[in-house]
């Protein structure tokens, strides 16, 4: 995973953007929109195919996003299609595109001025256009009717990372980009083979070029291509379809991800932000969801705090957790902003400032900065800049997350669920603690026992946080529990000047104007897993701030002596990553993979997993930054939709990952 550079542009006399990197225009100086419609939409027979399509979601792949012209054009046509054919089976359009040098937002907005008729669509894209962070960015538009997966990076690196199942992924390919003579590195057999691997059996493909090597290369990859009349004065272009696709997948057998075979009735066990985000994401897809919450209302557990910081957990040069949390954080921003249009909850994108408060923390943050993340995501501040940014005296440098901030997780969670309760697809059962799950193989249903009653569902998701051990199917998952206490301190005139969330060996939020208190925390206690007030933790929360900023007097104004606080128990993992996906059968896997270290990949059978049982656990203390994207991952998996993360990153989230790692090394998994 390498850093991303924005496109370097010039503008010609016609007002068309020209790439400095490739010395080529992004679209035709004359009738660029009409050419897009002719080459990519009409030659892929999209209006006709949409009418006859027998699935809920149609997936388009594109090899060069550029200004987004093709995406905006097909979005406009799909909107007209939905209006004209409201009863059609096809409800959603999914667009997967790649871009090595993404335009800056300013350049994107300028380019979009060329097409006034697309303005309503362009403005929505601009609103959620992502920062230049590598790999996949999912943008959900029109309440899920339109989804854009925008992959930033070289297509030769990104395309092999796109997850796909045996039946393929793409229904239509837009083979676009700068001319082959201008960008020969992209137009090669590896590209054509990659397109074929992602294609479904009935996939079509169209491209503006008539170059012989392109037609021959696509034919060799498995497409049947032919020359057709080009647009306007262009004599020819090529178009075709997949001739014969072999069934294959790029998921490793021991990290297999399978969709639900029946998601007519989905049960979610839990009541926190994970459950709420997942329920919203599934209902958006037209799924019937029932929530089972052991408490009288949502967000009574770890999701019940007044203020929680939202910022990405990053490490080194774009490795490990960064590949989950960087796009996860950006998606969380999108999710929260969209939720705020429908429900009320306290939040403020005021930024996050993380202090270099001692040598160890400074070294850690410098190593993180070595990853060359875009300044839109994170950048360093001097001590003077830090003081100006936070609004209070400070004598140390920091890193700043300008897109970060805080929100009230309790209000967000409850608001999401209350909104869902107004729909016909969702039901919440409070004070229903699920005691057991039993699978009926003959009927292909799960039976949930709660409150002395039995409930049946075709698919179940366990999202009950620190309660995961109460169900036998998830009891062996290698996760831990940590108690946390957050202290609430009243505002003072000085503390009210804090303008950003402040992180050190703890964190402090700005004053919430709606209750005139700030939050400071949070403790980590593995030995007392209860919800009782802890006086020592209360004192320690305040003392950490004084200890980390010994030269400042304002820190002593933080008064926690009123013992205002909240306790919760986090569900945590050793590698700081959530557990999202199919639940493995622990006892069977021990036998099935007893000799895994001596087997070749092609000889290994798919890992044994409980049918139609999934988990969404281990969010730890960064759940607000990861839960929305993890919900999108799991909902996509359950419904068989394209997945929004690289296939190798998905292995890092697989619920059986720690068992498999040990078994591949020949180690027992009885103790983890």
Swiss-Prot record:
Which cellular compartments is it found in?
Cytoplasm
Q: What is its main location?
A: cytoplasm
Catalytic activity reads: 5-aminomethyl-2-thiouridine(34) in tRNA + S-adenosyl-L-methionine = 5-methylaminomethyl-2-thiouridine(34) in tRNA + S-adenosyl-L-homocysteine + H(+)
Gene3D superfamilies assigned: D-Amino Acid Oxidase, subunit A, domain 2, FAD/NAD(P)-binding domain, Vaccinia Virus protein VP39
What InterPro entries does the entry give? FAD-dep_OxRdtase (IPR006076), FAD/NAD-bd_sf (IPR036188), MnmC-like_methylTransf (IPR008471), SAM-dependent_MTases_sf (IPR029063), tRNA_MAMT_biosynth_bifunc_MnmC (IPR023032), tRNA_MNMC2 (IPR047785), tRNA_S-uridine_synth_MnmC_C (IPR017610)
Q: Which domain of life is it from?
A: Bacteria
User: What's a single GO CC term here?
Assistant: cytoplasm
Cofactor entry = FAD
**Region tRNA (mnm(5)s(2)U34)-methyltransferase: start-end pairs:** 1-243
Keywords attached to this entry: Cytoplasm, FAD, Flavoprotein, Methyltransferase, Multifunctional enzyme, Oxidoreductase, S-adenosyl-L-methionine, Transferase, tRNA processing
- UniProt-listed Enzyme Commission number(s): 2.1.1.61, 1.5.-.-
Q: Which GO terms describe its molecular function?
A: flavin adenine dinucleotide binding; oxidoreductase activity, acting on the CH-NH group of donors; tRNA (5-methylaminomethyl-2-thiouridylate)(34)-methyltransferase activity
Q: For the region FAD-dependent cmnm(5)s(2)U34 oxidoreductase, what residue ranges are annotated?
A: 269-672
What GO terms describe the biological role, i.e. biological process, of this protein?
methylation; tRNA wobble uridine modification
Endpoints of the signal sequence: none
Which family does the similarity line name?
Answer: In the N-terminal section; belongs to the methyltransferase superfamily. tRNA (mnm(5)s(2)U34)-methyltransferase family. In the C-terminal section; belongs to the DAO family.
UniProt xrefs under NCBIfam families = MnmC_Cterm, PRK01747.1-2, PRK01747.1-5, tRNA_MNMC2
According to its UniProt entry, the function of this protein is described as: Catalyzes the last two steps in the biosynthesis of 5-methylaminomethyl-2-thiouridine (mnm(5)s(2)U) at the wobble position (U34) in tRNA. Catalyzes the FAD-dependent demodification of cmnm(5)s(2)U34 to nm(5)s(2)U34, followed by the transfer of a methyl group from S-adenosyl-L-methionine to nm(5)s(2)U34, to form mnm(5)s(2)U34.
Q: What is this protein called?
A: tRNA 5-methylaminomethyl-2-thiouridine biosynthesis bifunctional protein MnmC
What gene is this protein translated from? mnmC
């Amino acid at each position: 995973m390498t850093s991303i550079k924005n496109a370097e542009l010039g503008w010609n006399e016609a007002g068309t953007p020209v790439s400095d990197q490739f010395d080529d225009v992004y679209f035709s100086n004359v009738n660029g929109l009409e050419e897009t419609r002719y080459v990519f939409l009409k030659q892929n027979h999209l209006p006709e195919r949409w009418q006859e399509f027998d699935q809920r979601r149609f997936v388009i792949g594109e090899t060069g996003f550029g200004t987004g012209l093709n995406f905006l054009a097909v979005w406009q046509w799909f909107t007209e299609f939905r209006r004209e054919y409201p009863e059609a089976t096809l409800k959603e359009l999914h667009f997967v595109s790649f871009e090595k040098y993404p335009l800056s937002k300013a350049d994107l907005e300028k380019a979009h001025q060329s097409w006034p008729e697309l303005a309503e669509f362009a403005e929505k894209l601009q609103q959620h256009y992502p920062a230049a962070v590598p790999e996949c960015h999912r943008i959900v538009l029109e309440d899920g009717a339109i989804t854009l997966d925008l992959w930033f990076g070289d297509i030769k690196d990104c395309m092999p990372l796109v997850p796909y199942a045996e039946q393929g992924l793409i229904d239509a390919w837009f083979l676009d980009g700068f001319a082959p003579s201008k960008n020969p590195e992209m137009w090669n057999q590896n590209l054509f083979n990659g397109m074929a691997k992602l294609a479904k059996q009935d996939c079509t493909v169209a491209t503006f070029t008539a170059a012989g090597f392109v037609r021959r290369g696509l034919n060799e990859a498995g497409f049947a291509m032919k020359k057709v009349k080009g647009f306007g004065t262009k004599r020819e272009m090529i178009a075709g379809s997949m001739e014969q696709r072999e069934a294959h997948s790029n998921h490793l057998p021991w990290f297999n991800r399978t969709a639900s075979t029946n998601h007519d009735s989905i049960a979610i066990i839990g009541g926190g932000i994970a459950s709420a985000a997942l329920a919203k994401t599934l209902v958006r897809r037209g799924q019937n969801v029932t929530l089972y919450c052991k408490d009288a209302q949502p967000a009574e557990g770890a999701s019940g705090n007044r203020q929680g910081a939202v910022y990405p957990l990053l490490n080194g040069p774009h490795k490990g957790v960064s590949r989950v949390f960087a796009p996860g954080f950006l998606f969380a921003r999108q999710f929260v902003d969209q939720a705020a249009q429908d429900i009320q909850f306290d939040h403020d994108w005021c930024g996050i400032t993380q202090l270099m408060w001692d040598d160890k923390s400074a070294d850690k943050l410098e190593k993180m900065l070595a990853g060359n993340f875009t300044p839109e995501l994170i950048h360093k501040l001097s001590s003077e800049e830090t003081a100006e940014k936070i609004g209070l005296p400070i004598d140390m440098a920091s890193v700043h997350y300008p897109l970060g901030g805080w929100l009230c997780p309790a209000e967000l969670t409850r608001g999401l669920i209350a909104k869902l309760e107004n729909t016909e697809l969702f039901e919440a059962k409070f004070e229903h603690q699920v005691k057991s799950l039993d699978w009926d193989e003959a009927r292909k249903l799960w039976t949930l026992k709660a409150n002395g009653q039995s409930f049946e569902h075709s698919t179940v998701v366990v999202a009950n946080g620190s309660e995961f051990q109460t169900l036998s199917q998830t009891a062996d998952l290698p996760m831990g529990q940590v108690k946390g206490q957050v202290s609430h301190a009243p505002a003072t005139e000085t503390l009210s000047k804090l303008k950003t969330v402040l992180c050190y060996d703890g964190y402090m939020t700005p004053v919430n104007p709606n209750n005139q208190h700030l939050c400071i925390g949070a403790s980590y206690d593995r030995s007392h897993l209860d919800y009782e007030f802890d006086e020592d933790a209360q004192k320690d929360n305040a003392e950490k701030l004084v200890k980390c900023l010994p030269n400042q007097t304002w820190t002593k104004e933080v008064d926690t002596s009123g013992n205002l606080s909240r306790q919760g128990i986090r569900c945590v993992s050793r590698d700081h990553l959530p557990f999202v996906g199919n639940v493995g059968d622990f006892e069977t896997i021990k036998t099935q993979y007893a000799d895994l270290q001596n087997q070749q990949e092609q000889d290994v059978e798919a890992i044994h997993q409980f049918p139609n049982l999934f988990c969404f656990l281990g969010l730890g203390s960064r759940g607000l930054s990861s839960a929305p994207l993890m919900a999108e991952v799991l909902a996509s998996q359950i419904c068989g939709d394209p997945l929004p993360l690289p296939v190798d990153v998905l292995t890092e989230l697989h619920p059986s990952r720690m068992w498999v790692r040990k078994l591949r090394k020949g180690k027992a998994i009885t103790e983890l």
